[in-house]
Amino acid sequence: MVGLVFDQKRYKTELARKYTTFLSKYPEIFSDLVSGSHFDFAIYKSIEEYDVHIQLDIFNVYRNGQGIEIKPGRATNGDLELALSVDAVEKLIQTKNKVDYAQLLGSFYNEPDEKNGWIDFMLHKRTQTLIDMGYGRFAQTAGILEDDDDIYSI
């Protein structure tokens, strides 16, 4: 798989540049997703800013036939938004493979903490559609879901 980052100078923060560079080095993180999957990564300073939708930075990832494309800004008609705290991103970019990344991501969802890191999801498509696109498999690897039926509780 190939990971491509576009327009890195358009990111508002150095953290987003580091995160997109990290994701481009490990495109296998997205190997469970079908080609055409398109979603946003939004970085937030705090839970309060997340609650009122004030992102520190935002970019989108598109899964194509060869790998991923990462671009600044929101996806057009994205599948979901993955909201992440600054602390979570700083820790995630230290991981070395898909499984470690997924498990740490899952811990931020299952045990959110304002100081140590948190993530949340905003789904923009039907849950069954997201399962069919491979998001369920990734969530299982992350420990967010025990099986596909658990996605309905997100």
Predicted regions and their residues:
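Feature captures hydrophobic
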Residues: 1-154
